[in-house]
């Protein structure tokens, strides 16, 4: 239902945000960007 799709959307946003944060962190650490 609505709550399931909302939860899935939140998980998707959290995953992409986490991935972006990890990439930024890795970039700062080993200067690969």
Curated annotation (Swiss-Prot):
Keyword Transmembrane appears in the UniProt entry: no
One annotated Gene Ontology cellular component of this protein: extracellular region
Keyword RNA-binding found: no
Keywords of this entry: Amphibian defense peptide, Antibiotic, Antimicrobial, Disulfide bond, Secreted
Major place of residence: secreted
Disulfide pairings: 27-33
Expression sites (tissue/organ): Expressed by the skin glands.
Residues of the signal peptide: none
Pfam families referenced in this protein's UniProt entry, alphabetically: Antimicrobial_2
Cell compartments where the protein resides: Secreted
Example GO BP: defense response to bacterium
Sequence similarity: Belongs to the frog skin active peptide (FSAP) family. Brevinin subfamily.
Function: Has antibacterial activity against the Gram-positive bacterium S.aureus ATCC 25923 and the Gram-negative bacterium E.coli ATCC 25726.
The protein's name: Brevinin-2PTd
């Amino acid at each position: 239902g609505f709550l399931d799709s909302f939860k899935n959307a939140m998980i998707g946003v959290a995953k992409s945000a986490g991935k972006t944060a990890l990439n930024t962190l890795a970039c700062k650490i080993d200067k690969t960007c």
